[in-house]
């Protein structure tokens, strides 16, 4: 359950067999496709770019659309360096979610405990 705030906010959709780790936030305008894994501490919003390492691309929401996490993606929390000005001068970084791989047999065996607990 949840509340759409502001009124024009787009919903969150989490498809079947998604594993959501503790302290994870999935907010307005985010779609998580089936069998994805969101590791502990991952924060996803429509305005958050997601860095897909296996496919060497950046996933962003289209104007007015939703951020879509691909089916089977394994997403962890990460950071990227601030590349200009004060941030660069002080070695600052910004949070970013990173897809490190897509589900495989090893991932499935690691998440099997979740099935037993259901």
Regions found by a protein language model. Give the residues of each.
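C-terminal catalytic lobe of FAD-dependent flavoproteins
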Residues: 90-118
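Structural signal for interior beta-strand "rungs" in well-ordered beta-sheet cores
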Residues: 1-87, 99
């Amino acid at each position: 359950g949840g509340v759409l705030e502001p009124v024009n906010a787009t919903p969150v959709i989490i498809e079947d067999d998604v594993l959501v780790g503790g302290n994870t936030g999935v907010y307005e305008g985010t779609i998580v496709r089936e069998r994805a894994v969101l590791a502990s501490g991952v924060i996803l919003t429509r305005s958050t770019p997601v860095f897909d390492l296996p496919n060497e691309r950046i996933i962003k929401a289209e104007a007015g659309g939703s951020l879509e996490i691909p089916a089977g993606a394994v997403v962890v929390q990460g950071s990227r360096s601030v590349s200009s000005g004060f941030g660069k001068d002080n070695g600052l970084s910004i949070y970013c979610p990173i897809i490190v791989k897509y589900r495989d047999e090893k991932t499935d065996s690691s998440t099997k405990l979740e099935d037993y607990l259901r």
